[in-house]
Amino acid sequence: MLFAVRMDVDIPRDLDPEVRTDLVAREKAYCRDLQKAGTWVHIWRCVGQYANVSVFDVEDNEELHRVLWNLPLFPYLTIEVTPLAQHPSDLAADDAGA
């Protein structure tokens, strides 16, 4: 199942700088591991914002929940999830039916 996920980040300004550095490093490592595993398919930065739009490929809602819940930045995220389905005008849909 594919999901588009928007994540807006709001790390408190008064968070200890060492804690912030560690948190961001762990988030980056977790993100890369999920990308290598094929779970985190795409990630795009939202220009001018501390936010991203990502696409996840997971078995079900529960797996997506676990993936998001385990993000080190999870306590500081506002998350919007949209389930995705293939669009009939997608060129890949034409190729699959050929």
Regions found by a protein language model. Name each.
Residues 1-98:
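Conserved, structured core segments of small domains
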